[in-house]
Amino acid sequence: MDQPAGGTGKLRASAGEDDSMELSTCQELLHRLRELEAENSALAQANENQRETYERCLDEVANHVVQALLNQKDLREECIKLKKRVFDLERQNQVLSALLQQKLQLTANSLPQIPLTPLQPPSERPTSPAPNVSEGPATSLPSGLCAGQREVCWEQQLRPGGPGPPATPPPALDALSPFLRKKAQILEVLRALEETDPLLLCSPATPWRPTGQGPGSPEPINGEPCGPPQPEPSPWAPYLLLGPGSLGALLHWERVLGGPGEEEGIRQPWASSRAPPSAQGPSSGPHCAPGSSSSSSSDEAGDPNEAPSPDTLLGALARKQLNLGQLLGDTETYLQAFLAGATGPLSGDQPGPGKPNSPDPGPPQVSKSKGLPKSAWGASTPEATRLGFGATSEGQGPLPFLSMFMGAGDAPLGSRPGHPHSSSQVKSKLQIGPPSPGDAQGPLLPSPARGLKFLKLPPASEKVPSPGGPQLSPQLPRSSRIPCRNSGSDGSPSPLLARRGLGGGELSPEGAQGLPGSPLPCSAMPDSAQLRPSQSTVSTALSPGPVVSPCFENILDLSRSTFRGSPPEPPPSPLQVPTYPQLTLEVPQTPEVLRSPGAPSPGLPESCPYSGPQEKSMDRAGSESPHASRRTPGGSSKKPGQGSGRRPGDPSHTPLRDRLAALGKLKTGPEGPLGPEKNGVPARSSAEKARALVRSGECAGDVPPSARPLEQPEAKGIFRGAVALGTSSLKQQEPGLTDPGARVYSSHSMGARVDLEPISPRSCLTKVELAKSRLAGALCPQMPRTPAKVPTSAPSLGKPKSPHSSPTKLPSKSPTKVVPRPVVPLGTKEPPKPDKVKGPPWADCGSTVGQPTSPVAGPADPSQGSEGPAPHSAIEEKVMKGIEENVLRLQGQERTPGSEAKHRNTSSIASWFGLKKSKLPALNRRTEATKNKDGAGGGSPLRKEVKTEARKLEAESLNISKLMAKAEDLRRALEEEKAYLSRARPRPGGPATVPSPGLGQAQGQLAGMYQGADTFMQQLLNRVDGKELPPKSWREPKPEYGDFQPVSTDPKSPWPACGPRNGLVGPLQGCGKPGKPSSEPGRREEMPSEDSLAEPVSTTHFTACGSLTRTLDSGIGTFPPPDHSSSGTPSKNLPKTKSLRLDPPPGAPPARPPGLTKVPRRAHTLEREVPGIEELLVSGRHPSMPAFPGLLTAPPGHRSHQTCPDDPCEDPGPPPPVQLAKNWTFPNTRTAGSSSDPFLCPPRQLEGLPRTPMALPVDRKQSVDPSRTSTPQGPAFGGSRTPSTSDMGEEGRVASGGAPGLETSESLSDSLYDSLSSCGSQG
């Protein structure tokens, strides 16, 4: 308008001269006015349109959030309803069991005449076992007969006219009550059904036979007093398993075995459970002895005998002529148990899951039907006591069943090796861990479907015995079990025992055991789990330690012998055993492993039988179960304990996951217990697990490792073991890329999990989540996902190598492993590096672990990567998919600018609401990653499409970037406020903390995380305040890193640079340094000297966590990322970044490790680039980042370097890194572009698949974002954290190439999400 004004003046001046001139001028001015008005209106319209678009995006995000919250609420309500229902049912069971008890007592009083007669007839009845019967049974039968007698009563009721002697009892039974008769009939029907149950039939009696052989263990439990008879009781273990749960089956078995003694033995075990102290010793000793041989034979012939078992049982019962009074008493107890469903399901389920199910299909069913009642019974006062909630002493009684279950399934393992004591101790440990849980465990072993159904109830009943609180907790897990069953469902369907162990067993054992643990510790379920593990550990560590070690080792050995033939690893096994015991579930899984290996029956007679079905189940599980077993072998090679631990981790995986997912409170409560287990990692992980039910698998994996560290006082050893495992896994992967590779990968996941958990709660969490996802997928991903993932695992072997996208995706998973592998992997990695040229991008995300594991780990990773997303509940997945689609739609509509659209798609929008803090966005990314992984090349095509779209919508993208810039300003204001609020803490923690993380990697990292976060905030505040010294300092260190990076590149030490990423986890970081030294010792040393790599990484990592938390606080603050795009350069960069992000979807799992890195970026960017990685990337691209002009300034030179990834010229830029060391934690993050670059190995890694995090200064700068994000998580954290680093990273990404950058961005988003989740979980 000035012109018009000026023009007007001119017009007036000219008016005097020439009116025509004036007119022309006026016309010109008017024309200009019109043009300006049109332009103004156009701008206003465009502004309005952009505002509308932005609002639409916000609305969409809000809708997604609301939808997710509503879904969460609905699920929570559903869980609550289910919990209430379970509680009500349990109460009903208790009431009914009480009534039944009263009735039985009345009937028993009325029919007390047959008290001892039946005992003697039983002796008579079993011709061969008669002596045995009379020996121990006579003594124990009075109390022990309850089980057998009950069965007899039922049998008699079922067939009142059965044998002549029973004729009297039948009348007595009839006299007992029509209720009993009905019960007997129901049991009969159930037995018949069970007999026809394919699952039960499938499970060979033989496996239980070994259990029977291991029954020595049952006896130790039943008559722990009877140390010598233990071998004898061992046979009874199956019977007890059957007997308590399905006395009918036991009876058939006994009769088949000729087991009056056996029957009695069963009864005795029952008696033991009923009157564990008195009946236990005598009954278990004598009857067990006969039962021992009988049991084996009966187990062998169990199936054939099963058909006649009802009649035979009735006949045997009739022969035995059990005392009617005893029968009534036993029946009462048995019915009580049946009603309670605690003992019944335990024993019944146990037999079912055990191979006795097949020999005793009917009885297991009966036991199952009883199981619930028994559980209720357990809930009922008498049975509850019996169940061994009160059952330490009782534990022997009910635990006999449980022990028998566990002994048959768990202790028999030890027993099989010929360690009756061990088996008994295993039981003991089982008892200790879950006296009640033992029962739950019993069901765990049982058929998955029934086991789950009954298990759910029995755990509930178990809960019932335990305080209401514990009951609820278990119930929640049960509820979650339903979803978990989907994931654990795998377990239930795929392998009878394997899945039973996982699906049913794990869930139930976790729940039941947890509950028993609850009863024992009377604490929350998590506590019970912890207690249980330690108890188990103690038990196993004690006498069973060695024996169990053989047991579990055998299991492990089976799996290992299959792969590694690690029979010599039994000593480590004890650790494993503790792990398994720690996860009572693991014990069932141990049988799984035993069965799964099948071939390896070294000292595992049962193992072989198990192996048959288990192997099938393993096959069923597909790669998952095998992965689980193989995982164990992989880990076991170097660290049998570790491998075993991993395996347990997997098993524990499900229960923990169930607990976490099912028990929202477990997030809080279990987290507390788990936190201790995991150095606080579990807490976060548990919360996150809870967040993603599917992730429950991951969570379980996470927790188990944590439990393991707790259990095994070799936490450090575990870390080392984890590293060793990682190494071992890597090695294994190298040798056996395909099966072992997958296995190794699984192992590695476990190892990574183990390492990560101990190392850095947050980084661990993210990585653990990945590991959890993998484990969940490998072990028991949630149904389809698991299969899909399993295939992913197989294809992933190739996938990681072939597509960068896939590798990128893999890195996510790999990163999880990366932490564990870094030390050994460094060496291994270097060799794999060459193999993994493609791995580099993948390695970018998980460069540290990526390369070594790349071939195998990659495939495994993909499966887990997909699993990671897959582990989310179907609803979650749907939500994620929906959000993803919406985001894509919005991007297509609003941000069609191709790359930007894509970048924002994955990165910006995701970062807006999801990437940054939203669980949903992260889920979206994960979904994308899953999709990309699912379609090996899918990721690339998507990216390409998005890119094309982005180009079209580039203009729009710029506008959106401007809008986003505004949003970022707002966010910055919020973040500044937050930063100021947290400034006090951060500043103190600042630089001093950095060395701490690098040095005290595990603890230092924790400390560093917090201090680092503070420092990060402080630095952010400084940045905001206009203090650019830190950026300069960061820049200074950068050159060093750059120098370091170039060296790295040559030897591929970048992977060692990845070590820094592992460095995220302090220990790994340290390892990473050592690894690097080999190729670039000097450089590495430089890095350490500066603390730049390890220290910054660890500190950054912590900072990232802290920042993440703050970022989470900022929440939508993620939107600002587009802000950076607002500048023309940023938008261009954004598209690339977007591509990177899109790539990252495949590398979404890698994103997790980057997540930590990303978190740092976000954390560092909080103020300037809180907008998100995109913003960071953009900012890196354009030094016009308002928040960090200094950083931006530094980035320009570095940018040029980044642009030239091969330019070691960055070394000039790196000189500032000297200071970087000071501010490494946060400064790196801030100086992302300039000083972080040293950590930015990613550019090079991205570009030069070598993925040498430190390849070149330039590379590093470029890589910093991607690599930092992915490969050198530690450094990535440090570097990525810095907004400058992010900016530089973006530039580096652009320079490196869209794909790597994209991958990195996505990885960052994903990893950011993970970090945020971890931070959120932790608080």
Curated annotation (Swiss-Prot):
Keyword Disulfide bond listed? no
Basic and acidic residues composition bias: residue spans: 647-660, 925-934, 1027-1041
Q: Which residues form a coiled coil?
A: 22-109, 942-985
Q: Where is this region: Disordered?
A: 1-22, 113-142, 156-175, 204-238, 260-314, 341-714, 778-875, 892-948, 979-1003, 1027-1323
Q: Where is this motif: (S/T)X(I/L)P motif 3?
A: 918-921
Q: Which UniProt keywords apply?
A: Coiled coil, Cytoplasm, Cytoskeleton, Microtubule, Phosphoprotein
- For bias type Pro residues, the affected ranges are 162-172, 226-236, 353-364, 1143-1153
Q: Positions modified as Phosphothreonine?
A: T654
Residue interval(s) of motif (S/T)X(I/L)P motif 2: 808-811
Post-translational modification Phosphoserine, affected residues: S436, S447, S466, S473, S489, S492, S494, S573, S760, S1184
Which residue intervals make up region (Mediates interaction with CDK5RAP2 and is required for homodimerization and microtubule bundle formation)?
1-135
* PTM (free text): CDK1/Cyclin B-dependent phosphorylation mediates its dissociation from centrosomes during mitosis.
- Extent of motif (S/T)X(I/L)P motif 1: 480-483
Where do the record's region annotations for Mediates interaction with beta-tubulin and is required for microtubule bundle formation lie? 743-1136
Q: Where is the composition biased (Polar residues)?
A: 531-542, 1097-1112, 1124-1136, 1225-1237, 1264-1273
What single Pfam family name could you report for this chain, choosing any that match?
Answer: NCKAP5
Give one GO biological process term: microtubule bundle formation
PANTHER family, sorted: NCK-ASSOCIATED PROTEIN 5, NCK-ASSOCIATED PROTEIN 5-LIKE
By what name is this protein known?
A: Nck-associated protein 5-like
Record the organism.
Mus musculus (Mouse)
The gene designation is: Nckap5l
